[in-house]
Amino acid sequence: MKVLLDTTFILPTLGIEVSEEVEDGIRKLGEIEAEIYYSRFSILESIWIAIRLMKKRSFDVERFDQGLGSIMKSGRYIELEETYRVFKEALRFYMLGHRDMIDNILYAASINLGLKLLTVDSELREFIRSKGLKDTLISPDQISDENSG
């Protein structure tokens, strides 16, 4: 299975707490030995989250740095190469009413690159359903060996 991680799913590696559902999804990906993709735009969004946490003084910079190195240098995660088509499609989703451009880029990339987008984002899921768009989304409870083919 080839899976693109929504930003929420890279946060634990960066030392940022997430829900048990997200932790479970990451564990399942490891069990089925999925090909795991990430976007530089998720790294940017993670930095925004880190900045918010820094302001609250509940942030471990060293852990974030180690996690960032793990994501970008370990070879376990594959960096996306977004294309012109991905950005064009992301803008189309914005014009259709979905205002989160990071989500739009990730969703467009999943379509154009043939990846499943692992997310717990119900707003994105509802947008895709309401517009009759191709559903590439997968939630943690949908990860299994049967899907890894």
Predicted regions and their residues:
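Short, well-structured N-terminal submotif of metal-dependent ribonuclease cores
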Residues: 1-38, 53-65, 145-147
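Alpha-helix capping/helix-boundary segments
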Residues: 9, 42-43, 85-86, 106, ...
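Short amphipathic alpha-helical segments and helix-helix/interface helices
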Residues: 23-27, 68-69, 106-107, 125
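ABC-type ATPase nucleotide-binding domain
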Residues: 49-50
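Acidic, PIN/NYN-like endoribonuclease modules and their adjacent C-terminal/linker elements
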Residues: 78, 108-149
